[in-house]
Amino acid sequence: MRNNKTPFLSAIFTASIRGYQRFFSAFTPSSCRFYPTCSNYALWLLCFESPLSAMGKIAIRILSCNPFCSGGIAYPTTRLKRPSLIQSHKDSNRNFKTITFWLVPTKSHATYYIIKV
């Protein structure tokens, strides 16, 4: 279920994050305290959330990335009515779809962890 509500705004945010990854982050030492990295966390959220909702969650994640936080594994979460096959495409040689993300229910079963395959 790709975010189609505001594709232009999502595309701008996605392009800016990819630019950051390619031109700035690639030339600095790896120092992220979390998995997935904050920029990947942002890209994954932009696939599932509206851009404004995603920006709020991304801001909280970036603010928690400081020396006083222990870090660790922190997957983004989203609310969906039902899980679906996300960002699939047909392989040119075979007639099957490739799974890009797994949606794993949290303990509350109201939200899902977004895990990239």
Curated annotation (Swiss-Prot):
The record's comment on protein family reads: Belongs to the UPF0161 family.
Q: What does this protein do?
A: Could be involved in insertion of integral membrane proteins into the membrane.
Location within or outside the cell: Cell inner membrane
Main site of residence? Answer: membrane
Under Pfam families, the record lists: YidD
What is this protein called in UniProt?
Putative membrane protein insertion efficiency factor
Q: Which HAMAP family does the UniProt record give?
A: UPF0161_YidD
Keyword Transmembrane helix present in the record's keywords: the answer is no
Lineage: superkingdom: Bacteria
- Enumerate the InterPro entries for this protein: Membr_insert_effic_factor_YidD
What does the UniProt keyword field contain?
Cell inner membrane, Cell membrane, Membrane
Transmembrane helix in keyword set = no
